Amino acid sequence: MKVVIYFLIGFLLSFRLEAETIKIGSLQYGSVNWELKLIKELELDKKNNFNLEIVELASKNAAAVALQGGAVDLIVTDWFWVSRQRSEGRLFSFVPHSMAAGGLIAPKDSNIVNDVDLKNKKIGIAGGQVDKGWLIFRAFYKKKYGEDLLKLSKPIFGAPPLLNKKIKQKSFDAILTYWPYQAKLLTDENFEKIIDIKDILSELGIPSGMPVIGWVFKEKWGEKSTEIFKNFLKASDEAKQLMLESDDIWDDVRPFM
């Protein structure tokens, strides 16, 4: 009888541990991955009573497909994507993650002084045609000048690391990229920021401090996984706070960058 009881206890414990695993899809080159890796490195998931499984993906589209197909529980994406999905009857939810955004970067010798100089220019765009930065920038340009940048310029879409490499090779006149890759380029004195996405949001009348990206998940998953999600958000906040307050913690983050 004792053997049976021990077996049942072991089975229930293993089931409980499996139920507390949260799978998060993350871009290999994204800053979200830094945070998730730090959570694992410091065992903040164990501290907060869940197990984090990081599923590294190659692109934003791959992340969306993984979430829709149930391969992961969470991804980070923008509220444009969530809004579109919900309008088509696919119920995804959004919890704010970050207000960080990128911007338009150009070589100092490119003759691009401001956004009006983009006509017929080859622009590298991080992500795809429905990426938040590109949609925001197009809306801003349309409002300001009455023209669509999609038709006015020559956009080419690609992964941020590749865009950084290509603009240094003068393959682009400018790139619209995410903030970590913007920051890397701006350490090079040959490049400058033309306009920031945050400034564009302000021009469009969107309140300052509005998070652009967030944790996105199926509504049904959120309803049945409230506790583990709260635990994850707590670990996420702890990781962010450590990165904000400690210079030393970046030594742990650096290998993932």
What are these regions (language model features)?
Residues 5-14:
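Bacterial N-terminal signal peptides
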Residues 12, 43, 140-143, 252, ...:
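Generic structural signal for isolated residues within well-ordered alpha-helices
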Residues 15-19:
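Sec/Tat signal peptide C-region and signal peptidase I cleavage site
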